[in-house]
Swiss-Prot record:
The keyword Transcription regulation does not apply. Is required not only for elongation of protein synthesis but also for the initiation of all mRNA translation through initiator tRNA(fMet) aminoacylation. It comes from Methanosarcina mazei (strain ATCC BAA-159 / DSM 3647 / Goe1 / Go1 / JCM 11833 / OCM 88). Zn(2+) binds at C151, C154, C163, C167. Keywords: Aminoacyl-tRNA synthetase, ATP-binding, Cytoplasm, Ligase, Metal-binding, Nucleotide-binding, Protein biosynthesis, RNA-binding, tRNA-binding, Zinc. It is found in: Cytoplasm. Its EC number is 6.1.1.10. GO terms for cellular component: aminoacyl-tRNA synthetase multienzyme complex; cytosol. Belongs to the class-I aminoacyl-tRNA synthetase family. MetG type 1 subfamily. The lineage of its organism: Archaea, Methanobacteriati, Methanobacteriota, Stenosarchaea group, Methanomicrobia. This is Methionine--tRNA ligase.
């Protein structure tokens, strides 16, 4: 990933995050923005930089109005529910903003009026009669999500303001083809009405220059925006027919478009912080302070084109950098709430007792920030057990435990040149990676230092040395404790809550969150009392991960059943949904419809394979001998099946929701016998019982229609 470095290391820095929309719960896709931003802000503070970290809830727009209407509450009440939810969730994850407001705060209403009025005064906003979708049955105009139709660019189903299912392009009012009212489902028509436009086209040259020379951040965002500018910019309708929102100056019947007042929230939240801290918001938005926006890749257009043009036109400072993350997949599937491929931060993670730092670590260390991140419960388990437990946790605990049991305090000693050199090397690499927004590189460098610590400890064998030379052993322990101190400071931005425990365990009474990186090289004070250490990380066991996978599978099955019942059965999303446009279009050509008299289910045709590939599968007929529920699971059954071997095979199958044990015992079933063994909820499965699944509503075990000997092969 290419990046553009910040120009100055002395200016104050404002770090912001794309605003969470106050219309639903926090999911792991949200955290791809907020956790890296928090890590970045913490790291800058550790370098001694002046950092302000702000965010807030995005509270306007049609989705909130629609959802509130469906729930029978006001938009304000809906916003209050989800604003509180996000605020509490962020704090649980160790994400602490200097200000966390809402775009419905008075500060944002006032600042939006100021900026829009300024744009009007300077001639950048003008009225225009346009075609607006109107529903005759509902007797109302239909802004944004109140209307759906065909995208004029790609033909996919789109909302009134965005083709979110297809090409992703922003749509202006009147562009949607074959409009349909989402309130009553009836056809909409276009009627003329006066609205107001921002002269975005006048900023084309400025934006190209700004994107080419001045804007820093990740080049995935910059190059994407430059491509849009090269295609030519059209003026932008900035008003909507809604009551909920920030009123357009002089027009009580219109509000500004949500993508006008939402980013202005960054300024309003900075104002709120400044009022509380007795500081100046102007040093960022009217001065030369740095402004770094962390966003999801899907809102690049707004932050790299609309937003800087508005700021430039109104005489405000423009962003210094835009850092755009890659997308998120769940278990190698395209993220989709409606299809069940989602991980909710609260009910799926925190409520099950998983430590917030484990998820922070996963998000930071899995891949480069701009690349696609796949969340998998098994990969989470592997990374935590192999890295945090076996490397970092192992070194910190064995060092502190040995020191506490044998000395009770920091022994006399000096930092060896080799130790200092390794710490300095890690610091240089971590700082450089953070400046490049390469959080995985930073974590890898920090973990390499922990690995060095384990090697140092093991090679010096302090458990032997203490019996021979207590002072020499003290020197080894002193250096291990110094490494532990350095690791606590370096890892603090990534796993702050756990490193606070380690810091206190080393006898420090100061605040690790306020400590600077440079303290990693400050020698420990001999005689400092050590606290009794606690294990910082524990292994994630198979049973626990199996339980989470079961919950995830049940959610997907429920989503499939719901969609099949409502829509006659859409296909389960294939892995091709995570492909680029060209690959996805090719994959879609391989889809066929299988119709029955009662329903229609879409089936994805997989690539053709050679017979040799099929021949590798050892598929046999087996007689079910015993079936019993798996403890701690509502879905799994332990099954013993005779497949023609000396002893019965033990299988674990997710069939408890579809069959009672009595319905399976004595039946002949089809078994994949040479599948690699796997543990599910602590029970080993040595094969797989094959079944048909229509998308979750029905699961049927495959059974021969004639009596046949156990062990008979499927050919």
């Amino acid at each position: 990933m290419e990046i553009r470095m910040s120009k100055s290391s002395s200016k104050p820095v404002l770090v912001t995050c794309g605003l969470p929309y106050a219309n639903g719960k926090a999911h792991i896709g949200h955290l791809r923005t907020y956790v890296p931003a928090d890590i970045y802000a913490r790291s800058l503070k550790k370098e001694g930089r002046e950092v302000t970290f702000v965010c807030g809830s995005d509270t306007h727009g049609t989705p909130i109005v629609v959802n509130a209407e469906e729930l029978g509450i006001t938009p304000t009440e809906l916003v209050e529910i989800y604003h509180k939810h996000f605020d509490e969730t962020f704090k649980q994850l160790g994400i602490y903003f200097d200000a966390f407001g809402t775009t419905d705060d008075p500060e944002n209403h006032n600042r939006t009026h100021d900026i829009v009025s300024r744009l009007i005064e300077k001639g950048y906003v003008y009225p225009k009669i346009i075609e607006i979708a109107y529903c005759p049955a509902c007797n109302r105009f239909l802004p944004d999500r109140y209307v759906e139709g065909a995208c004029p660019h790609c033909g996919e189903t789109a909302r009134g303001d965005e083709c979110d299912q297809g090409c992703g392009k922003h749509l202006e009012p009147g562009e949607l083809q074959n409009p349909v009212c989402t309130i009553c489902g009836g056809p909409a028509e276009y009627r003329q009405q006066e609205h107001f436009f921002f002269k975005l086209s006048e900023f084309s040259n400025y934006l190209m220059d700004y994107l080419s020379k001045d804007l820093g951040g990740t080049t995935n965002a910059i190059n994407y925006a430059r491509g849009w500018v090269k295609q030519g910019l059209t003026d932008w309708c900035i008003t909507r027919n809604l009551e909920w929102g920030v009123k357009f100056p002089g027009h009580e019947d219109l509000v500004v478009y949500v993508w006008v007042d939402a980013p202005i929230g960054y300024i309003a939240f900075t104002e709120e912080w400044a009022a509380q801290a007795g500081d100046s918001w102007e040093k960022f938005w009217k001065g030369d302070g740095e402004i770094v926006h962390f966003i999801g890749g899907d809102i690049t257009y707004h932050h790299c084109i609309f937003w800087p043009a508005m700021l430039k036109g109104a005489d405000y400072s423009v962003p210094t950098a835009v850092v755009a993350s890659g997308m998120v997949k769940i278990e190698d599937r395209k993220f989709s709430k409606t299809r069940g491929y989602v991980v909710w931060v609260g009910e799926d993670y925190l409520d099950h007792g998983f430590h917030p730092d484990l998820l922070r670590y996963y998000l930071a260390s899995y891949t480069s920030h701009t690349k696609e991140l796949n969340f998998s419960w098994r990969v989470l388990q592997e990374k935590i057990n192999a890295e945090l437990v076996a490397v970092l946790g192992n070194f910190l605990y064995r060092t502190m435990l040995f020191a506490f049991k044998n000395y009770g305090e920091v022994p006399e000693g000096e930092v060896e040149p080799e130790i200092r050199k390794e710490i300095e090397k890690a610091l240089v690499e971590v700082k450089a990676a953070m400046e490049e927004y390469e959080f995985k590189k930073a974590v890898d460098s920090a973990m390499a230092l922990a690995s060095f610590g384990n090697t140092y400890f093991q090679s010096h064998e302090p458990w032997k040395l203490i019996k021979e030379d207590r002072d020499a052993c003290g020197q080894v322990v002193y250096n291990c404790l110094h490494l532990a101190k350095a690791l606590s400071l370096i890892f603090e931005p990534v796993i702050p809550q756990t490193m606070e425990k380690a810091w206190k365990g080393l006898g420090h009474e100061s605040d690790i969150h306020a400590a600077l990186y440079e303290e990693t090289l400050v020698p420990l004070k001999a005689g400092t009392k050590l606290a009794k250490p606690e294990i910082l990380f524990t292994k994630l066991e198979d049973d626990r991960i199996g339980e989470m996978e079961e919950i995830a599978n049940q959610r997907v099955a429920a989503a499939n059943a719901k969609r099949n019942g409502v829509k006659g059965g859409e296909k389960e999303p294939s892995k091709s949904e995570g492909m680029g446009p060209s690959e996805a279009s090719k994959a879609s050509e391989k889809t066929v419809d299988v119709a029955t008299a009662e329903e229609k289910v879409q089936v994805e045709t997989l690539p053709v394979i050679d017979y040799e590939d099929f021949a590798k599968l050892d598929i046999r007929v087996g007689k079910v001998l015993l079936v019993e529920p798996v403890k701690k699971s509502k879905k799994l059954l332990r099954i013993e099946v005779d497949i023609g071997e000396e002893k019965p095979r033990q299988l674990v199958a997710g069939m408890a929701s579809y069959y009672t044990p009595e319905e399976l015992v004595g039946k002949s079933v089809i078994v994949l016998a040479n599948l690699k063994p796997a543990k599910l909820c602590g029970v080993e499965s040595n094969g797989m019982m094959l079944a048909a699944d229509d998308g979750g509503a029905i699961v049927a075990a495959l059974m021969p229609d004639k009596e046949i000997k156990s062990g008979s092969r499927i050919r």
